């Protein structure tokens, strides 16, 4: 569903509209969580997502978020707003569309993050309980 925002921005959850090259460029070259990720892997991750939401300004993709999971647990990944578009509340709107306005609003969500904790706390995220375990990726 497309949602207009002020300042010429819009949110859209249409997977066909996602600019995979734009996502790949940011995630592979500018993120701390997936430097060097191949375009093929990025394309597969987007194809396997249960929900994607992108942020556009005048038709150009300037933000993105992806969710994987099922009706019981959703994992939030690859969330970004390009640096030149930050500081306008767009990250809040991107997450609101992804989490609160989507079909998984009542589902348990998880994420890994090294920054933006205050932003995620606005959507109910907090430290994981002692019952959560993680297996690191093998290299």
Set out the residue ranges of the language-model regions.
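Conserved GNAT-fold acetyl-CoA-binding loop/helix
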Residues: 14-42
